Amino acid sequence: MGHRITTQSRGHGGPTYRAPSHRYKAALKHLGRAGETVSYKIIDIEHDPARHTPIALVDVPDGENTYVLVTEGMGIGDVLTWGADAEIRNGNTLPLQEIPTGSSVCNIEAYPNDGGKFVRASGVQATVTDKMEGRVAVRMPSGSTKWFNGQCRATIGIVAGGGRSEKPFVKAGKKYHKMKNTASNWPRVRGFAMNVIDHPFGGGGHQHAGRPKTVSRGTSPGRKVGHIAARRTGRR
């Protein structure tokens, strides 16, 4: 069969195909618990290999300093507040039921006190659109509307780092370093372009499969490439 093909190596789970989570700085969560109001000062803004948005290091007087998500307009020295009594201001975090309709929000909790799950990517925002009987409707970046428990917390503002994807990589080396921080297999080489020992479709005087590209569901792992258990192939 030749060498172990890429899909088999990925399934084995070596470090090449795993995200380097040992380099990630922190899992960004909302601070404080339900019913309490806390304020912390931003002492630094840093880059985290785990994400494309900057993160803020905040000073926690009675514990270890921790990181939070940065919204557009934040700066070193700003004081951020978490709690129902917080001011309606960029960067502050409140329960959704306390945030006015029409406000831009990010880092929304799926359930109260889970720390934040939705709208965390660079440059994205959601909008509070409606409130009804303890539930709040939010228009997500995808355009769909999702209802949340009114006690779920969210940060007011737009996630920092917008426009990141508009800047070209220019050099393959920069793309390489970006992809090394993820679990992605990059660059991805086509099976046709490989040597015959590296892939069932490899080898030959020109790039072609040289064998049927449809395989059964129970095919052995080294041959299970192409159209797997396909009902049909080709154009309709």
Curated annotation (Swiss-Prot):
GO MF: rRNA binding; structural constituent of ribosome
Biased composition (Basic residues): 224-236
Recorded GO CC terms: cytosolic large ribosomal subunit
Gene Ontology biological-process entries: cytoplasmic translation
This protein's UniProt keywords: Ribonucleoprotein, Ribosomal protein, RNA-binding, rRNA-binding
Biased composition, class Polar residues, residue ranges: 1-10
Region entry Disordered, spans: 1-20, 202-236
Pfam families registered for this protein in UniProt: Ribosomal_L2, Ribosomal_L2_C
SUBUNIT field: Part of the 50S ribosomal subunit. Forms a bridge to the 30S subunit in the 70S ribosome.
Function: One of the primary rRNA binding proteins. Required for association of the 30S and 50S subunits to form the 70S ribosome, for tRNA binding and peptide bond formation. It has been suggested to have peptidyltransferase activity; this is somewhat controversial. Makes several contacts with the 16S rRNA in the 70S ribosome.
UniProt record similarity statement: Belongs to the universal ribosomal protein uL2 family.
Name used for this protein in its record: Large ribosomal subunit protein uL2
Organism: Methanospirillum hungatei JF-1 (strain ATCC 27890 / DSM 864 / NBRC 100397 / JF-1)
